[in-house]
From Swiss-Prot:
Residues 2-77 form the Carrier domain. Keywords: Cytoplasm, Fatty acid biosynthesis, Fatty acid metabolism, Lipid biosynthesis, Lipid metabolism, Phosphopantetheine, Phosphoprotein. 4'-phosphopantetheine is transferred from CoA to a specific serine of apo-ACP by AcpS. This modification is essential for activity because fatty acids are bound in thioester linkage to the sulfhydryl of the prosthetic group. It is found in: Cytoplasm. Signal peptide: none annotated. GO terms for cellular component: cytosol; membrane. The modification O-(pantetheine 4'-phosphoryl)serine is found at S37. Disulfide bonds: none annotated. This is Acyl carrier protein. PANTHER family: ACYL CARRIER PROTEIN, CARRIER DOMAIN-CONTAINING PROTEIN. The keyword Lipid biosynthesis applies. Belongs to the acyl carrier protein (ACP) family.
Amino acid sequence: MSNIEERVKKITVEQLGVSEAEVKIDSSFVDDLGADSLDTVELVMALEEEFDTEIPDEEAEKITTVQAAIDYVTANQ
């Protein structure tokens, strides 16, 4: 597991209040982990802070799964 993957999963657990076992690479934040629109905004903000990056709204809308978050961070480091 990459460092980015570990950090994204940790943020997901903290922001959504789910167990680490529930967070799979292909988990959808909304469909699988029960996030609502406010949760997803807070998740994106936490990712921005953790990885010291700015995620434009049009890109944030595409980050719907754990893998999508990892891919975005990896591509924009």
